[in-house]
Amino acid sequence: MTSISDDEFDQLLTDFERTAVHLETRDAYGTTVELPHMAQWAAGEHDDLEWLQGWCATLRNHIDAGRTVRRARIVSEPLSNYQQWSYSIAQPMIDAGEDIRWVPRRRVSSIAIPGNDFYLLDNALVVFLHYSGDGLGVAKVTSTDPHDIQLCRTAFEAVWQQAIPHREYQPV
């Protein structure tokens, strides 16, 4: 596995050719970009979500080019504060073409899932996302190992079968 920088990761998310799938398994994350916006939400303050526009533009470009972007979020219920906030800001990404689905953790107990969140790009490259206990991203590593690719593809598709589309999911 090869460690990559944030810039290299961003480039991979721009350059894939056909498909990107993203499996999220944690109940809380924290990025320097997200944390101030989550704090606004927690305080009941309005957020115009302008900070999401770059990602939404990238998503629209992918969709316009015929690519697909799917995200499955495995969540504990009742939702953590982070996931409640995440649910509240998902619509702009969905409007831009990302298919976001929610999976109550109890639905996936018998599915073998990799130990880290990941992106699988074009069924050819896995990017494993490593986090600290507090949910801050600490590393990104890539793999083209066929075993890793098969593990992630199988796990994602099995989770996806249990997933509830955003518009139908009722947060608990």
Set out the residue ranges of the language-model regions.
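PLD/PLD-like phosphodiesterase catalytic module centered on the HKD motif
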Residues: 1-172
